[in-house]
Amino acid sequence: AELQHESFIFKGFRNVRTDASEIGNTLFSNACLPSTFFALKPGEHRLGPGMMAVRVLDSEGGRGLSAFFTRTTLKDLATNTVTTTVKPLPEGAPASFTGGVGVFLINAKPSTTELNIGDPISMDFEVTGIGNLRTMAAPVFSITDENWKIFDPAKTLTDEEDSDGIEPGIARFSQVIIPEFQANAIPSFELTYFNPINAEYV
């Protein structure tokens, strides 16, 4: 099955549920394919149609010996379209907001706690939770002076560890910082996200 839209990240199908139903004198197989998607921008969007290739029984059947065997035909099916409205995030987001929407926890580990002038420190962050880990950026250091050199963070997020909006996932960030003075402590950092359940920035 396939469903694409430039304004959404589509997480694919999972845990397909099947059952049967009878319509008239014909027995049909039903499949429910649940999924989730993450919006990239606000506004009204038309989602679909989704496309799916399925094998169906050949209604013409066969003649002679071939009638004893099941014949199938591959067909492309299209779903209906759905119009959805995505609300914009509230104004007043803190400067440390990096686009995360969901519920998250963060764990940080420095490569060393012995700080020396000019020695690099690698900060490893693990962000776990349910939400849009795919589009979330790294935590933000609360540094107001120029005595720290900060390098761009690297992000690691595999498809297997990504959150689908139902189950939690984990994203990893690694960032190098260098003190250019005799620092006594690693600078503080923040990960601010929007909690859609409480409708507030956390």
Language model regions located:
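Regulatory and interaction patches adjacent to catalytic/ligand-binding sites
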Residues: 1-202
